[in-house]
Regions:
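Conserved beta-strand hairpin/beta-sheet module of binuclear metal-dependent hydrolase folds
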Residues: 1-37, 137-149
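Active-site neighborhood of phospho(di)ester-bond hydrolases with catalytic His/Asp-centered motifs
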Residues: 19-22, 40-47, 68-70, 127-129, ...
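Active-site metal-binding motif and surrounding structural segment of the metallo-beta-lactamase
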Residues: 28-72
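Short histidine/acidic/glycine/proline-rich micro-motifs that form metal-
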Residues: 72-76, 197
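Metallo-beta-lactamase
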Residues: 77-126, 132-202
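Histidine/acidic-residue-rich catalytic or RNA/ligand-binding cores of hydrolases
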Residues: 201-210
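C-terminal regulatory/interaction regions
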Residues: 218-279
Length: 279
């Protein structure tokens, strides 16, 4: 449950291990679900606040709780000042309302991953594209792939799939390579943070690839205001359920979608200038 919506942010549990505890603002819901017993560990796909902001509060509650995160994200758990400064630029005075308080995690609790490890029955692979500190986990026994934001957002019961593209790390080519890595696992299902399980793995990943390119091209051709209006119109044409629409827009705030794609193109000036209509 995040700000009154049940299908926006999910925390997965396997054998007592939690994958992406979510924001501190949703922590009461998580604690109600797991009870008083300390989890075996926290596995983070990445350190974006909707996935990981509750981490510090959980370690504060259970001081021996171990946390696994990519090596690029680990320093920002220990000292979240830069992460907070970046988030404040993005969310302004809505930061604490959306994500709650972000507490530091003692360095002794943090285990840095690079990809290629096996941790608590989970294979780990480095999957940048959405974030430079993103990893995915494959639970070898069940074949479930815990994919964070790499496999995009899909709010049930709609089939609309939308990759979240906030700044600063969006890289379409790296993202496509990460999708190929996940697909090569041949997982039995994908476990999305936003939201739920996906059984038709190949079809879903194909749509993510297509949608990534579509959104990148749209952002290349339009300015921020026009892109947001265009994206909102396309989403509303596909979703006629007001509750589902509200949950999607909470999981993927449209105001931040353009920024990551625009930054992606700004690093590729030659390609951006070749866009149709570019002068």
């Amino acid at each position: 449950m995040h700000l009154g919506h049940p299908h926006v942010i999910g925390c997965w549990e396997v054998d007592g291990v939690l994958i992406d505890p979510g924001p501190e603002s949703s922590l009461p819901t998580l604690l109600e679900a797991i009870g008083d017993e300390q989890p075996r560990a926290l596995l983070l796909t990445h350190i974006h606040l909707d996935h990981a902001a509750a981490t510090g509060a959980m370690v504060e509650r259970w001081p021996s709780l171990e946390v696994y995160v990519h090596e690029r994200g680990a320093p920002h758990l220990v000292d979240p000042s830069k992460l907070l400064a970046s988030a404040e630029r993005l969310y302004g005075d809505r930061l604490e309302y959306l994500w709650g308080k972000i507490e530091p995690v003692p360095e002794a609790n943090v285990h840095a991953l690079s990809g290629g490890e096996t941790v608590l029955g989970m294979r780990v692979v480095y999957t940048p594209g959405h974030a430079s500190h993103h990893v995915c986990y494959l639970h070898e026994e069940s074949g479930t792939a815990f994919v964070g934001d790499v496999a995009a957002v899909r709010i049930p019961p709609t089939n609309l799939i939308l990759p979240p593209t906030p700044p600063p790390d969006i890289d379409i080519e790296l993202w496509e390579k990460s999708l190929a890595i996940v697909e090569a696992w041949e997982p039995s299902r994908l476990a999305l943070t936003h939201f739920g399980a996906v059984a038709n793995v190949g079809t879903h990943l194909d749509v993510v690839r297509t949608r990534l390119r579509q959104e990148a091209e749209a952002a290349r051709e339009l300015d921020a205001e026009a892109y947001e209006a265009d994206l909102k119109q396309r989403i509303e044409a596909d979703i006629d359920d007001a509750q589902v629409l509200a949950e999607l827009l909470q999981a993927v705030p449209l105001a931040y979608q353009y920024g990551g794609l625009d930054r992606y193109w700004s690093k590729r000036p030659g390609l951006a200038e070749s866009a149709p209509g570019a002068s």
